[in-house]
Amino acid sequence: MATPSLRSHEIPAHSQEAGNKSISSGSRRGLLWHLRARQSRVGLFEVGPGHELHRMTRMMQEGLWAATQVSKNNPPTGPTTQKDYLEVMTQVHEEGFELGTLAGPAFARLRKSIGLTEEDYQATLGPGDPYLQFFSTSKSKASFFLTHDQRFFVKTQRRHEVHVLLAHLPRYVEHLQQYPHSLLARLLGVYSLRVAQGKKKYFIIMQCIFYPTSRISERYDIKGCNISRWVDPAPEGSPLVLVLKDLNFQEKTMRLGAQRSWFLRQMELDTAFLREVNVLDYSLLVAIQFLHEDEKGIHHSVFSTFKSIQGVSKSKGTGDQNCRMLPDLPNALHILDGPDQRYFLGLVDMTTVYGFRKRLEHVWKMVRYPGQSVSTVSPAHYARRLCRWAEVHTE
């Protein structure tokens, strides 16, 4: 897929004011960090001094603070233009690294449209508390981090995956404008990091589907197939956070009640978009939280689309946009309450294109696993299958 050429400019970075710790990976190694890493933040490990990725994450934090300062000082005005999607801003830091912000104005507008201020974004991702490392059951070699409050998800990406994201970004933004309650995870920024003259590393920031995390009892990554879709559950009493897969969910059902029809319709709309951009291998993330007795049957205060989502076209009715009444909760776009349980739901990973390599993989898997459900199929088949899974596993 051809990707438009990016327009790059380089500026010196303005460091955060004195009081923040400088980037260092060697100081205070040892017992202190190991004690903090094993504290009660179940299955997540603080990337503190002594951690092999501490220096990299500190550079991310410093770089993101400086990058967001630019968008705070120069907020984009007017409608989004093609230039906004092509812009690359590179900031050179005195500490010996460069951070690139890709399509910065487009993402600044997207953050504003979901009510996320630049001040909040900067404070959460910038220097201060260390990131938390999350060990994924994914086959990907990517590194996964959460901000300390677990609101935002940081994931390293390969260069070609970033090119796919940027190529689809205008249509992604258009889809979110048309369907503001979409289940698609909100992508908040795409960045590059290079130390000295080394190779660039790319990473993305997105809202965490599984937030707020308190009382979440189960987490799943669903693709709608069976091959290699089982994870051995953690032993009872283990603090390890595991994201389970399709076969672990096989005998379960999500009891969505009155929200089921909305959910199934939005799954159709979102997977249709992913099919149109020729993407597969995405996942439906599912987390479950049991409601307390005093929460069951209570209708939380709700607010309408036009009050909660900025930039929504008011010429369209809520029926056209498949809108629902949102709960008055953090991360409301990804939360649906059933009669007994609260569900955290979102579609993630839109970087795998159905090209020649995936077509070959499809043929090979069909030969190796005849008659079985494999992950690598055409985008149309993939979308239908995941929607079918949602229909079968909800009531």
From Swiss-Prot:
SUPFAM superfamilies: SAICAR synthase-like. Changing residue 155 to R: No effect on lipid kinase activity when the protein is purified from mammalian cell extracts. No effect on lipid kinase activity when the protein is purified from mammalian cell extracts. Keywords: ATP-binding, Cytoplasm, Kinase, Lipid metabolism, Membrane, Nucleotide-binding, Transferase. One of its GO terms (cellular component) is cytosol. PROSITE patterns: PIPK. Pfam families: PIP5K. The keyword Kinase applies. PANTHER family: PHOSPHATIDYLINOSITOL 4-PHOSPHATE 5-KINASE-LIKE PROTEIN 1 (PTHR23086:SF46), PHOSPHATIDYLINOSITOL-4-PHOSPHATE 5-KINASE (PTHR23086). May act as a scaffold to localize and regulate type I phosphatidylinositol 4-phosphate 5-kinases to specific compartments within the cell, where they generate PI(4,5)P2 for actin nucleation, signaling and scaffold protein recruitment and conversion to PI(3,4,5)P3. This is Phosphatidylinositol 4-phosphate 5-kinase-like protein 1. It comes from Mus musculus (Mouse).
